[in-house]
Design a protein with these regions (language model features):
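Beta-propeller folds
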Residues: 1-393, 399-405, 409-413, 430, ...
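Cap/lid segment of the alpha/beta-hydrolase catalytic domain
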Residues: 133-147, 159-165, 179-181, 396, ...
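Conserved Rossmann-like nucleotide-binding pocket used by diverse enzymes
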Residues: 171, 496, 569
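Core-facing hydrophobic residues within beta-strands of well-ordered domains
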Residues: 189, 286, 539, 564-566
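Residues forming the Rossmann-fold NAD(P)(H) cofactor-binding site
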Residues: 551
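A conserved short beta-strand
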Residues: 563-575
Length: 582
């Protein structure tokens, strides 16, 4: 495994392994690099086989040596980015019952501090109820999970990963006396839902393959071994997650893969913990639910009836069968519904149309709609309904590739918004110094591929460019603000996002046409975008960047068209696809 020439990277030794899959013989010379006990490695990296560790260390040493000349500028850029981040900051307080909750970051503190104050008091009288920095001290590695206050606001369940394995442990704290309870729940996905009576909580347990596979209930004061298993998913291709309706009446168990879903609910107002099925899973049919308490109905977001970009349906909460579902917000092709929420008086719907997001507010009394839009050519938009079902306002989060995050308070009745927080850049920032642009490249089959571009107004033509792409799992890449990106753009680079097929920027068809047998479209779209930027004299010397499934995109693009690109960054690339899946 030693390099033949010190100017070349270490060469992994070859050891042929053959196996048959679907009557085809597959050959792999590097099978030995994949440790068979990877589940143990996730829990404890030190058990990685010595020959694999040796090769990884050799690669890292060679890389560090070759890139050592970049250390000075790396340090400069790190300091530069750090100066642009406001080290001491606070989030917007969110009301939950008789309390307001918020977080703060402090200088030289790695993690946030969680604070709260009584609703009739003021922020000046707030108290710390959870300090992630304090909790991290006993561990060499620490990653915060979530913090979930009980319905009576007396208890806090919090989760963390102390090994880097993404198996989260859950602990419980008494918020009245600040003492930790003995409860300790291991191997979870990090999220919980409290029971209404605060006597315990629901959680998802991960199996040895890191799959969230089982729903449990934990009664406070008992050992994890005594926890009740409520549901176990036998199909290894499906995953579980839990949430609760904003009304808090129902715990929601979502069972899903990347294209099919099934929902089961528990009525939290009843003593038994019996799961009730909404409708059985059916291949390629997805749905999710919310509860409308005033109208005793469930609202259902689904792609049923060939509504590939989704529609909103409704059914009486006591008549769950699919035959009782009726359209509430009918299907409109080309308008993708990405999210929705139900409050006491309003339904909030988030949509994506022509690659741009918008928020639609529906008055439940008369079904009148109000559309919230913004004026920039490209931007990112999101909303948060808060913790309270009875709320008459929402938070709106807006940013663009040039505009730092703006938080709006939006009054649903008055249809008025006001800025309540602006993301501060301590070194200063003027969005007017930048040009934003949405352009379209024509791919091999005539499809128009959107490209979001930002550059300084004084950047000349044919500038060096970083082109980013992902194009997998239906994930849309938002043209949002990034502090670190400024260090490239302010040095004269163009930054571009290729919204290729495999994402969902132009609806569900956009996703379907970039997966499985259509996956080649993702790669061709990406190469087309790079060629377009050169042809239009926007770019020269294009560096491409993608991570995980986006790393597959980078690897494939380099192999198909190596001369198109100047440099490539494949971050944790998922490039051994068939071996992994098969």
């Amino acid at each position: 495994m030693s390099p033949v020439n010190k100017n070349y990277p270490p060469r992994a030794r070859k050891k042929l392994v053959k196996r048959k899959v679907h009557n085809k013989e597959l050959s792999d010379h590097f099978d030995w690099i994949r440790d068979n006990n990877w589940q143990e490695v996730l829990h404890s990296p030190s058990v990685l086989k010595k020959n694999i560790r040796k090769y990884i260390d050799e690669e890292n040493r060679w890389t560090n040596k070759k890139l050592s000349f970049l250390k000075p500028i790396e340090k400069d850029i790190f300091r530069e980015i750090k100066k642009k981040i406001k080290e001491e900051d606070t989030s917007i307080p969110q009301k939950d019952g008789n309390w307001f909750y918020y977080s703060e970051t402090k200088r030289n503190k790695e993690y946030s501090i969680l604070r709260r104050y009584k609703s009739y008091s003021s922020r000046k009288k707030s108290c710390i109820y959870h300090d992630w920095n304090k909790e991290s001290k006993p561990y060499k590695y620490f990653k915060p999970g979530g913090a979930f206050n009980s319905n009576n606001h007396s208890l806090l369940a919090w989760s963390f990963d102390s090994k880097g394995s993404e198996f989260y442990e859950i602990k419980v704290k008494d918020l009245n006396n600040k003492k930790q309870l003995k409860d300790s729940i291991k191997n979870t996905d990090g999220r919980i839902v409290w029971s209404l009576n605060n006597e315990g909580f629901y959680y998802i347990k991960m199996d040895k393959n890191h799959r969230p596979s089982s729903l449990y209930f934990h009664l406070l004061g008992t050992h994890q071994d005594e926890d009740i298993e409520i549901y176990n998913e036998k199909d290894s291709g499906y995953f579980l997650n839990i949430s609760e309706t904003l009304s808090k009446k129902y715990l929601v168990l979502n069972i899903h893969n990347h294209e099919t879903s099934e929902v089961r609910i528990i009525n939290q107002e009843e003593k038994n913990k019996k799961l009730k099925l909404i409708t059985k899973r059916k291949k390629s049919i997805e749905y999710s639910i919310e509860h409308d308490q005033e109208n005793s109905r469930l609202l259902i977001l689904t792609n049923k009836d060939n509504a590939i970009d989704f529609k909103l349906m409704e059914t009486n909460e006591n008549k769950l069968s699919k035959k009782n579902w009726t359209d509430f917000l009918p299907y409109r092709e080309g308008t993708l519904i990405t999210n929705f929420s139900c409050l006491a008086q309003y339904i909030i719907v988030q949509e994506l149309e022509n690659g741009l997001p918008r928020i639609v507010v529906i008055n439940k009394k008369n079904n009148k709609k109000n559309i919230i839009k913004f004026d920039e050519e490209i931007y990112d938009l999101d909303f948060n309904e808060g913790y309270e079902y009875e709320s008459n306002k929402i938070k709106i989060y807006y940013s663009s590739m040039a505009t730092p995050l703006l938080t709006y308070d939006y009054k649903l009745k008055d249809q008025k918004k006001r800025i309540i927080k602006k993301q501060q850049i301590p070194t200063g920032h003027n969005e007017k110094n930048y040009n934003l642009k949405r352009v379209y490249a024509i791919s091999h089959d005539g499809e128009k591929i959107p490209i979001s571009i930002i550059k300084r107004k004084d950047t000349p033509k044919n500038a060096p460019t970083l082109l980013y792409g992902y194009g997998s799992y239906g994930i849309s890449i938002s043209p949002s603000f990034s502090v670190s990106r400024l260090s490239l753009i302010d040095r004269g680079m163009v930054y571009a996002i290729a919204h290729i097929r495999g994402g969902m920027e132009k609806g569900k068809k956009w996703y379907e046409n970039g997966k499985k047998k259509n996956k080649l479209n993702s790669f061709k779209d990406f190469i087309t975008c790079a060629e377009f930027l050169k042809k239009e004299n926007i770019s020269k010397n294009i560096t491409i960047h993608g991570g995980s499934a986006g790393g597959l995109l980078i690897g494939a693009s380099l192999n198909i068209s190596p001369d198109t690109f100047h440099c490539a960054v494949a971050e944790v690339p998922f490039v051994d696809v068939l071996n992994t899946i098969l």
